[in-house]
């Protein structure tokens, strides 16, 4: 892992991205994605991680921002991934901070993630899920065919 500076800072941002068309699932529809971004700066180098809070899991934008902000002092003191596991519960906030820490480590060392994570070789991407927006049968069939 990269050497830890005592001058790290954590910044939390909210971003909104439009979605092409309307994305519908059984719990509702949306035309934009609300994203929380965690940025960890160390000597001018910035690691970035993001997350999308889901009400289904008891998360909200405000709650996730508060969770991320609650570890700002620990990040400033050099918190790494291992300590993060006990500092935040599993969920969107921890994901954003964890990704920012990994991104920062890669940028500080100039190494790709697989080397920083001490893997033998890069891993191939794996599709773990694919969600189709609710629509007519014909449109859903066309979307499924286009994605396969």
For the regions a language model picked out, list residue spans one by one.
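N-terminal capping/lid subdomain adjacent to the active-site entrance of alpha/beta enzymes
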Residues: 2-148
